[in-house]
């Protein structure tokens, strides 16, 4: 029995975009992907500033100090409170094993996979996105062979929530392309 889902269009926001990039590079998918839409997508490892590197170094030092047995006995919640203050909301809410996974995933650079994406790709980016900067979208547009980038003004990482009317118009236009509608 063959699997035929019909027309397949994948849409992913942030981490979902990362999943699509990996999926599009997987050999032997049981279906063809007609189009992809990456919205404020993750996947490009950011260039780390000196400020960021110092923050990581200070976090590791604090983690070592707060994890020291006598300190842990005196201040049992100090390390967890520090983690919650320093990390993202996702990181703070995650279990210890999931935290390790998050760190590995966030640091994985998928740039080399972009040029292998064969499906037409729409990239939608909030101009003010700080989680996955617009520069990432511009790089993806250059590297994905059949990609176009739409920049949404007055929007950040959740461009589809911050500018829903514009976002929906862009979606409708892309989805109707080549259908003669």
Where on the chain are the PLM-derived regions?
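Flexible "cap/lid" loop of the alpha/beta hydrolase fold
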Residues: 18-26, 31-68
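Conserved alpha/beta-hydrolase "acid-adjacent" motif
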Residues: 130-136
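Catalytic histidine-centered segment of alpha/beta-hydrolase-like enzymes
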Residues: 155-169
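Conserved acidic catalytic loop of the alpha/beta-hydrolase fold
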Residues: 1-8
């Amino acid at each position: 029995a063959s699997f035929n889902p019909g027309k397949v269009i994948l849409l992913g926001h942030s981490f979902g975009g990362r999943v699509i990039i990996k999926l599009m590079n997987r050999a032997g998918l049981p279906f063809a992907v007609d189009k992809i839409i990456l919205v404020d997508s993750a996947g490009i490892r950011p260039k780390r500033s000196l400020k960021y590197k110092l923050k990581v170094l200070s976090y590791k030092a604090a983690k070592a100090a707060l994890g020291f047995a006598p300190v842990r006995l005196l201040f049992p919640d100090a390390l967890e409170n520090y983690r919650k203050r320093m990390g993202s909301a996702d990181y703070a809410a995650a279990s210890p094993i999931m935290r390790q996974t998050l760190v590995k995933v966030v640091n994985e650079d998928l740039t080399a996979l972009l040029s292998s994406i064969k499906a037409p790709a729409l990239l939608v980016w909030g101009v003010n996105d700080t989680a996955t900067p617009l520069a990432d979208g511009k790089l993806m547009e250059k590297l994905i062979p059949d990609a176009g980038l739409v920049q949404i003004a007055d929007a950040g990482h959740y461009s589809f929530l911050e500018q829903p009317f514009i976002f929906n118009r862009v979606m409708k236009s892309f989805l109707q392309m080549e259908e003669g509608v």
